[in-house]
Amino acid sequence: MLSSVVFWGLIALIGTSRGSYPFSHSMKPHLHPRLYHGCYGDIMTMKTSGATCDANSVMNCGIRGSEMFAEMDLRAIKPYQTLIKEVGQRHCVDPAVIAAIISRESHGGSVLQDGWDHRGLKFGLMQLDKQTYHPVGAWDSKEHLSQATGILTERIKAIQKKFPTWSVAQHLKGGLSAFKSGIEAIATPSDIDNDFVNDIIARAKFYKRQSF
């Protein structure tokens, strides 16, 4: 009788031990949205100086300036949060980076005229140049966001190939810079230390804290 009790006690103990693991090898963990950062590095660990300071923007620059503008655009961008997350996961890009580009380029679409910038040259939430990229879909559609995010990933991969010894952070920053100004303009790490890239990373960190 005693041996039987000991046996079942051991079985219960083993079961409890296995149950202490958060998930088995056959199960995938359910990641909190704030933990998802895609395939191109964790932006929360990346250094940035924020928007460039100059004589005309002493008060609205640096990390505080970037965060201020990101917060101002939050209300306009919030309705696209689910869409941004879907597109981000499809392309393995941090949704916060997509949100940051939307903030920087179109203020969440609030300054666009039928999807176009004031010169009629760039289209959509992420502002694709019509001559370079030939935008598709409605300006605030999943099709547009997917096209633009796909272009961003192409640029990141091109930088990875061109500069294989660069760090993960440099590859992402290089891809962002190439998305804005082209790959040809990038030759050294100093070329990716620019206003656009630093501003995007700072804004992205803000949006990551807002659960993007």
Swiss-Prot record:
Here the disulfide bonds are: C39-C92, C53-C61
Domain of life where this protein originates? Eukaryota
Q: Per the record, GO CC terms?
A: extracellular region
**What Enzyme Commission number(s) apply to this enzyme?**
3.2.1.-
Tissue expression, as annotated, is: Strong expression detected in the eye and weak expression in the testis. No expression is observed in any other tissues.
Q: Is Transit peptide included in the keywords of this UniProt record?
A: no
Which InterPro entries does this one have? Glyco_hydro_23, Lysozyme-like_dom_sf
Where in the cell does this protein reside? Secreted
Keyword line = Disulfide bond, Glycosidase, Hydrolase, Secreted, Signal
What Gene3D superfamilies is this protein classified in? 1.10.530.10
- Example GO molecular function: lysozyme activity
The question of whether Phosphoprotein is a record keyword is answered with no
Primary enzyme class: hydrolase
Q: What is the role of the protein in this entry? A: May act as a potent antibacterial protein that may play a role in the innate immunity.
Describe the family membership recorded for this protein in Swiss-Prot or TrEMBL: Belongs to the glycosyl hydrolase 23 family.
Q: What is this protein called?
A: Lysozyme g-like protein 2
